[in-house]
């Protein structure tokens, strides 16, 4: 399953929509909840300075759209 993680690069400032970044993770999980938990743990372990805002499971249609926009790249830690 592919998850899209919305985050701020620092926890020092209040979140602003204009500075929200995204990354994509390929998580092997048996449920959506397990995948979200695993995604959060991966990001927090590897990028503790990131302020995670939201984690979204991508549907097939949304994944295709993300690939078409050119912004899609799986992050590996």
Swiss-Prot record:
It holds the Pfam family RpoY. GO terms for molecular function: DNA binding; DNA-directed RNA polymerase activity. One of its GO terms (cellular component) is DNA-directed RNA polymerase complex. A non-essential component of RNA polymerase (RNAP). Belongs to the RNA polymerase subunit epsilon family. RNAP is composed of a core of 2 alpha, a beta and a beta' subunit. The core is associated with a delta subunit, and at least one of epsilon or omega. When a sigma factor is associated with the core the holoenzyme is formed, which can initiate transcription. This is DNA-directed RNA polymerase subunit epsilon. The gene is rpoY.
């Amino acid at each position: 399953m592919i998850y899209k993680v919305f985050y701020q690069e620092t926890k020092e400032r209040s979140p602003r929509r204009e500075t929200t970044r995204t990354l994509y993770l390929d998580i092997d999980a048996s449920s959506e909840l397990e995948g979200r938990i695993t995604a959060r743990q991966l990001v927090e372990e590897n990028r503790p300075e990131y302020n995670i805002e939201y984690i979204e499971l991508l549907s097939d249609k949304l994944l295709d759209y993300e690939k078409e926009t050119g912004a899609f790249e799986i992050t590996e830690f």
